[in-house]
């Protein structure tokens, strides 16, 4: 018999069709989930009296042998078997005989692959969460050392207001916390079992879907079989979650690339996580963050690809959804190595506070503080204070100095209401620590934020 479904066909499938139709060379990644799902299904069938105890024992032992063969590398994956389900079932039947032919009772490949793929995605949601926690812990280690390290905060990539380096890193902790929450939310929402839905409409066999759901670690069985066998929201969600996470990684990577340049010198990546040039001997290139930026686009492509596959599929299952796996596999693997290498690159990175502080003396970072002084101390409306401060900035430009270094006499020429106490407002350090509102950049508020993220990770 050529194919397990070949009964109604009079001709053998062409080798070209085998090559085009087969998914076995990539969906075999799901062999653990497939074997575990089959054991759970067989266990339920035996409890329901559809299989005998002896048949269950044969199937369980046979599947264990198949698993050992796969993991030892002796299992032969054949294109002609079409997919891993058929490959494993054919090998099982070759080992144990007729009992293997009974395994597929009350089951379709439609619900079988939905179980396998869903369980893989659920597992990867949690593994990525664990990797994100490790990354956040590493960022916390760095941030805890730099709550007083001055850094120019920017908008439009222009110097805006002074902040501290830990506060800047805390912004990424916020992003990665949201990523964790998205993965965890997806896990909870999608933790339902498709097993027993069969092709699309359930089965007349007296099965127990709740039993298999419990055996496989699902929260419950799904509600509607028609939806369940064709649902790939769980795959789209992990792709979206990874895409969003990679976007956050890419933003940090962009800053690492800039900060490691001679124009900034805020950080230096270690030799272990840098590369050189084939022609320019002096080069030390930030290939890790550059590749992280590039791989973000690759993950986006997987998300858009699956969205496009799914956008016009009628209910229920269609072969189009075979195209769901490679993009997810690739995105997951990209996410895993990206999180690991970013963590290690940060761990070995050298922070250069001196250059960060020097950069705070460029761009008149205390301009807003002068405006605030005029409002608070001189009772000047903010819009007028904004205009006066602009004049002070222009004067500083004329003098070729930073606003934080301007002498009182020049400020009084602009507005005589300005007094000597303004100089404390213009201090870069004081400016950073003046922002004491909740979520602000003062050292005290930054330390509160770091404690918040530390507690978040402890509670997870």
From Swiss-Prot:
EC number of this enzyme: 4.3.2.1
InterPro entries for this protein: Arg_succ_lyase_C (IPR029419), Argininosuccinate_lyase (IPR009049), Fumarase/histidase_N (IPR024083), Fumarate_lyase_CS (IPR020557), Fumarate_lyase_fam (IPR000362), Fumarate_lyase_N (IPR022761), L-Aspartase-like (IPR008948)
Family classification: Belongs to the lyase 1 family. Argininosuccinate lyase subfamily.
Species the sequence originates in: Sulfurimonas denitrificans (strain ATCC 33889 / DSM 1251)
Pathway(s) of this molecule: Amino-acid biosynthesis; L-arginine biosynthesis; L-arginine from L-ornithine and carbamoyl phosphate: step 3/3
Predominant location: cytoplasm
Domain of life: Bacteria
HAMAP family: Arg_succ_lyase
Keywords associated with the record: Amino-acid biosynthesis, Arginine biosynthesis, Cytoplasm, Lyase
Protein name stated in the entry: Argininosuccinate lyase
Recorded catalytic activity of this chain's protein: 2-(N(omega)-L-arginino)succinate = fumarate + L-arginine
Gene Ontology biological process: arginine biosynthetic process via ornithine; L-arginine biosynthetic process
One MF annotation (Gene Ontology) recorded for this entry: argininosuccinate lyase activity
Subcellular location per the Swiss-Prot or TrEMBL entry: Cytoplasm
Pfam families, per database record: ASL_C2, Lyase_1
Keyword Lyase: yes
GO CC annotation terms, alphabetical: cytosol
């Amino acid at each position: 018999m050529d194919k397990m479904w070949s009964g109604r066909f009079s001709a053998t499938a062409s080798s070209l069709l085998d090559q085009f139709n087969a998914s076995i060379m990539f969906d075999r990644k799901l062999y653990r989930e497939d074997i575990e799902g089959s054991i759970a299904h067989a266990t339920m069938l035996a409890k329901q009296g559809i299989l005998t105890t002896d048949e269950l024992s044969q199937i369980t032992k046979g599947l264990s042998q198949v698993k050992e063969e796969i993991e030892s590398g002796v299992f032969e994956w054949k294109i002609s078997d079409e997919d891993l389900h058929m490959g494993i079932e054919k090998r099982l039947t070759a080992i144990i005989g007729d009992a293997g032919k009974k395994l597929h009772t009350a089951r379709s490949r439609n619900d079988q692959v939905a179980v396998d793929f869903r369980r893989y995605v659920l597992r990867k949601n949690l593994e990525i969460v664990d990797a994100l926690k490790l990354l956040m812990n590493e960022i916390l280690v760095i941030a805890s050392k730099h709550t007083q390290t001055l850094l120019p905060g920017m908008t439009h990539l222009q110097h805006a207001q002074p902040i501290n380096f830990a506060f800047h890193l805390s912004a990424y902790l916020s992003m990665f916390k949201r990523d964790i929450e998205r993965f965890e939310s997806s896990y909870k929402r999608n933790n339902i079992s498709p097993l027993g839905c069969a092709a699309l409409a359930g089965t007349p066999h007296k099965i127990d879907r709740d039993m298999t759901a419990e055996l496989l670690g699902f929260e419950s069985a799904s509600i509607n079989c028609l939806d369940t066998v064709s649902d790939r929201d769980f795959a789209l969600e992990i792709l979206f979650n990874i895409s969003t996470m990679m976007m956050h990684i890419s933003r940090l990577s962009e800053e690492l690339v800039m900060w490691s340049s001679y124009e900034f010198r805020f950080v230096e990546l270690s030799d272990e996580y840098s590369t050189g040039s084939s022609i320019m001997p002096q080069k030390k290139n930030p290939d890790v963050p550059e590749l992280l930026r590039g791989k973000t686009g690759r993950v986006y492509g997987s998300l858009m690809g699956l969205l496009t596959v799914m956008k016009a599929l009628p209910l229920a299952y269609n072969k189009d959804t075979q195209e769901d796996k490679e993009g997810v596999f690739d995105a997951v693997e990209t996410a895993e190595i990206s999180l690991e290498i970013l963590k290690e690159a940060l761990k070995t990175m050298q922070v250069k506070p001196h250059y960060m502080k020097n950069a705070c003396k460029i761009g008149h970072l205390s301009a807003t503080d002068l405006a605030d002084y005029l409002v608070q101390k001189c009772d000047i409306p903010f819009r007028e204070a904004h205009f006066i401060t602009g004049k002070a900035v222009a004067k500083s430009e004329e003098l070729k100095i930073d606003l934080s270094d301007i002498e009182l006499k020049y400020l009084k020429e602009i507005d005589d209401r300005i007094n000597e106490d303004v100089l404390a407002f213009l201090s870069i350090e004081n400016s950073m620590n003046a922002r004491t509102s909740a979520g602000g950049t003062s050292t005290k508020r930054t330390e509160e934020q770091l404690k918040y993220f530390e507690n978040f990770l402890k509670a997870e």
